[in-house]
């Protein structure tokens, strides 16, 4: 099995992910070891069995009186959003674009092989400390501008995707968990220190039980990383027919971490 990259082994300079990214010194750091062991445990892998409850069971949610936790200031204005993969040049251009939000995509626009997933995590960390840069073969240099940048939301892989490079009890782990876990471990506190937060776009959700599972992952992560409850926010993409019938329930399950629904592009 593979441990997550340590803070020291991640670099924001352009490079091919090396063995240092796959052999982590974070194992010697108790908080990192504790976080990762729990995060990748088999009990945290979502099981789709019996995931289709009767809508009558959730009628109280649809007719009840409840509300989500308040949104942070930087998620109040989302009139324009831009999306793209987590390669260096695309990220810099998106963050500099003037859009309200940049959805940094580890899913559909990103071929999910190991190099891309790990290099994407390197680039995400570089974006938060503003060290990310890129120079093309013609010598043109790209860097983050001074002043306002687009607010970044991370789209991990869906729950149906597995990651064969991280084994849990001899089996492939969840690609979604790997993306979420590496991002939170390396960037949750960085994002908060930068005046924003660890924000996600959740794809391919099919119902409120999947939303409940993500809510438990977020709450567990906040506790282990020592960040305030509700710091993690998620926008859920409604892109399956099943989720369209459970939108209220999805919002309710994620109410402490909810940042809205999106019907896709």
Residue ranges and their predicted role:
Residues 10-60:
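Low-complexity, highly charged intrinsically disordered N-terminal segments
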Residues 2-17, 51, 55-64, 72, ...:
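Conserved alpha/beta-domain cores
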Residues 103-119, 202-205:
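Glycine-rich, proline-tolerant flexible connector loops at the mouths of alpha/beta enzymes
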Residues 78-81, 96-108:
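TRNA-binding/sensing appendages of the translation machinery
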């Amino acid at each position: 099995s593979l441990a997550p990259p340590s803070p020291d082994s991640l670099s924001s300079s352009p490079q091919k992910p090396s063995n240092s990214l796959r052999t982590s010194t974070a194992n010697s750091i108790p908080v990192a070891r504790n976080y990762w062991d729990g995060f990748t445990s088999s009990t945290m892998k979502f099981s789709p069995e019996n995931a289709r409850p009767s809508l009558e069971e959730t009628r109280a949610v649809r007719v009840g009186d409840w509300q989500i936790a308040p949104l942070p200031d930087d998620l109040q204005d989302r009139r324009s959003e831009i999306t793209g993969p987590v390669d260096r040049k695309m990220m810099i251009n998106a963050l500099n674009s003037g859009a309200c939000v940049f959805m940094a995509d580890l899913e559909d626009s990103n071929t999910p092989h190991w190099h891309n997933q790990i290099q994407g995590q390197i680039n995400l960390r570089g974006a938060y400390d503003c060290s990310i840069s890129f120079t093309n073969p013609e010598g043109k240099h790209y860097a983050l501008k001074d002043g306002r940048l687009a607010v970044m939301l991370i789209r991990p892989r869906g729950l149906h995707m597995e990651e064969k490079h991280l084994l849990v009890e001899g089996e492939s782990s969840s690609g979604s968990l790997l993306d979420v876990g590496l991002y939170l471990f390396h960037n949750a506190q960085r994002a908060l220190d930068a005046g924003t937060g660890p924000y996600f776009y959740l794809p391919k959700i099919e119902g409120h039980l999947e939303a409940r599972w993500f809510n438990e992952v977020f709450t567990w992560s906040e506790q282990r990383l020592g960040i305030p409850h509700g710091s993690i926010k998620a926008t859920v993409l409604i892109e399956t027919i099943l989720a369209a019938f459970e939108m209220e329930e999805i919002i309710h399950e994620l109410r402490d971490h909810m940042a809205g629904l999106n019907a896709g592009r």
